[in-house]
Design a protein with these regions (language model features):
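Gly/Ser-rich, acidic/histidine-flanked active-site/gating loops
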Residues: 1-13, 119
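Small-aliphatic-rich amphipathic alpha-helix that forms the alpha element of a beta-alpha
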Residues: 70, 96-117
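Short helix-loop capping/hinge segments that flank enzyme active sites or metal/cofactor-binding pockets
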Residues: 13-68, 117-127
Length: 153
């Protein structure tokens, strides 16, 4: 329950970290190339990044490290964890590819993951995400293979 509570704001935390880390490429482009060519979103993100300090960024990394530690502790009880890859089927069209909340949380903690196309929602594929632990990629793939065999005998 502690880990689940800790990742409730994974999207916001990941976005803030990415905003800081994306500052320099955007800054370089805006300064040396064509700032007007940046999208409104990129300009807003750059302004947000410029308003952040190294101390804020360090605090974000500390928060991420604490979440990673909570996840690592799960290895004492579990060989892998599972979640959906998304909250539902991908929407139709190309305007939006769907909610990445579940995959963002996995990326935030930096763990290896495999998505198995074994479920359906509204007749469309819905992935089952199997998440492993640091340096346990072979174990993760073994569990993913076993699950794939169960869903598709």
């Amino acid at each position: 329950a502690r880990f689940e509570a800790a990742i409730e704001n994974a999207m916001a935390l990941s976005n803030r970290i990415n905003t800081w880390e994306g500052r320099w490429p955007l800054d370089t482009y805006a300064r040396d190339m064509d700032a007007a060519a940046l999208s409104q979103y990129a300009r807003e993100r750059l302004a947000d990044a410029r308003s952040m300090s190294q101390e804020i960024y360090q605090g974000l990394l500390t928060e991420r490290a604490a979440i990673r530690d909570l996840y690592a502790a799960l290895q004492e009880k579990f060989d892998a964890c599972m979640t959906l890859a998304a909250p539902g089927a991908a929407p139709q069209g190309l305007a939006w590819t769907g909610d990445p909340a579940f995959t963002v949380a996995t990326s935030l903690i930096g763990m290896p993951a495999v998505t198995l196309p074994v479920l359906k929602d509204q007749g469309l594929p819905l992935g089952l995400q199997v998440i492993g632990f640091v340096d346990q990629d072979a174990t993760l793939f073994a569990h993913a293979d076993a699950l794939q065999s169960i869903f598709n005998p």
